[in-house]
Amino acid sequence: MKIMKRYIQVIFICWLSINSITEVYGKDPIGISLVKWSFRTQTAILCDMAKENGAVAIDMVDPEKWDIVKEKGLTVAMADGIDMGIERGFCDRRWHSSLIENYKRFIPLLAEKGIKQVVCYSGINTDLSDEEALEACVEGLKPLLDIAEKANVTLVMELLSSRNTEEIFTKQRFSYYQCDNPEWGVALCKKLNSPNFKLLYDVWHMNDMGRDIMSDIKKYHSYISHYHIAGIPERKGLNRTDSFNYKQFMNLLKKVGYQGYVGLEPDRIEKNLKSTIQESITLLKNK
């Protein structure tokens, strides 16, 4: 009888273990999001396309669109529209007063809506040294950390290409953008020393800067809370003929324990939206 009871206990424990594993690993720990500005269609229609193809969130969403995304049963992966544009960021003290006012006003609203992340930018820098720009960013961002921590909202600074070139893709770069490499971004994270300040690693932009993407992820993943990606090199939708190994990228994110979103961010897709989204998500899901 005792042996039978023990056998039943073992079976029950095994059943619980299997179900726990299923709960944790049964779903992909990485969610795919669609960056709003990249797809030239109405927000509600983009939400429908996302759901049809296995995306779970919309990315870089302005305040007036937050409720639309929520009503469609999707998550706002990253809030946008609170900053003053990519060029006017925290490394320039001229914008501190307005930026601080904007973020202080919107962070409580983000918390009310259940939105966990909001983008911010270093801005362009033509006058300061890297260290001076770092100190300027610290001065501008530090007043926001307490309110962000209390609201459980993370400020996420995007890494962007500053490469100055006359090539066809010039519009997708930002000359003199300060936060153009993860070393500088990580230095800022360390100075701020807050769990509510992280980096947005844009794969297309960092590849454009000549970075070793896989090496960066291995070194700096603990400072990164969000990723953006587009077809490399043309910044279209993802394609199997691209020079970048998307499967290796996604597998590495899982290996380092990443459990956030990867935002699909091609450059202004106006035609063939459905097929672009479908093929891109298929590649990111390793199918």
Can you say where each PLM-predicted feature lies in the sequence?
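Histidine-acidic metal/acid-base catalytic patches
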Residues: Y25-G31, K36, R40-K51, G114-Q117, ...
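Short, hinge-like loop/turn segments at secondary-structure boundaries
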Residues: T75-A79, W95-H96, A136-C137, F174-Q178, ...
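Positively charged n-region of N-terminal signal peptides that target proteins for export
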Residues: M1-Y7
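Bacterial N-terminal signal peptides
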Residues: V10-S20
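Active-site acidic/histidine proton-transfer and metal-coordination neighborhood
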Residues: D92-K198, D208
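Hydrophobic residues in well-ordered beta-strands that form the structural core
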Residues: V76-M78, M157, Y201, L264
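Structural motif corresponding to the early beta-alpha repeats
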Residues: D28-T41, D48, E52-E139, D267-I269
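Conserved radical SAM core fold
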Residues: D83-R88, N125-D127, S162-N164, A230-K236
